[in-house]
From Swiss-Prot:
MF terms in GO: ribonuclease P activity; rRNA binding; structural constituent of ribosome
Function, in words: Multifunctional RNA-binding protein that recognizes the K-turn motif in ribosomal RNA, the RNA component of RNase P, box H/ACA, box C/D and box C'/D' sRNAs.
Subunit structure of this chain's protein: Part of the 50S ribosomal subunit. Probably part of the RNase P complex.
UniProt subcellular location: Cytoplasm
Swiss-Prot/TrEMBL GO biological process terms: ribosome biogenesis; translation; tRNA 5'-leader removal
Any Pfam family matching the protein: Ribosomal_L7Ae
Domain of life per record: Archaea
Protein name: Large ribosomal subunit protein eL8
Annotated keywords: Cytoplasm, Ribonucleoprotein, Ribosomal protein, RNA-binding, rRNA-binding, tRNA processing
One GO term describing the cellular component: ribonucleoprotein complex
Keyword Cytoplasm annotated: yes
Length: 149
């Protein structure tokens, strides 16, 4: 059963200098690792790219990791994803650039969001990354989201 979260409280205290939907600061090495895992999963597993496909994968319970770009304009395009991931208990991470996200997803255009559905050869790395994300989330007062198998 999904947990209902009040959007007014969820988005009440945005990080300074970040879009309102960014709930925690992601170090560049963690963001790069997430992009690397997405790229490996694209080649050996299964991914979806774009906000609509990402939303559907989360709602259907297929998502293992959601990647959300921080430089999306307008931000409302992806603003629902962190809240949806929290409700469905899906790990998510922010990456600094939609261009890098698109490239890691194997497309020649920017992508606002992408999702790992099957990690393929990156399964072990994905688990380690989710644990690292949970450490970061704890520093920002957010609960851990377990690795999805």
């Amino acid at each position: 059963m999904a947990v209902t979260i009040d959007p007014k409280t969820f988005y009440a205290n945005p990080l300074p200098g970040k879009p309102f939907y960014v709930r925690f600061e992601v170090p560049s090495d963690v963001a790069e690792k997430a992009l690397e895992i997405l790229s490996i999963a694209r080649q050996t597993g299964k991914i979806k790219k774009g906000t609509n496909e990402t939303t559907k994968a989360v709602e259907r319970g297929l998502a293992k990791l959601v990647l959300i770009a921080e430089d999306v304009d307008p931000p409302e395009v992806v603003a629902h994803l962190p809240l949806l991931c929290e409700e469905k208990k899906v790990p998510y991470v922010y990456v600094p650039s939609k261009e890098k996200l698109g490239k890691a997803a194997g497309i020649n255009v920017a992508a606002a969001a992408a999702v790992v559905i099957e990690a393929g050869q990156a399964a072990g790395e994905l688990e380690a990354l989710v644990n690292k994300i949970n450490e970061i989330r704890a520093k920002h007062g957010l609960n851990a989201i377990p690795v999805r198998r």
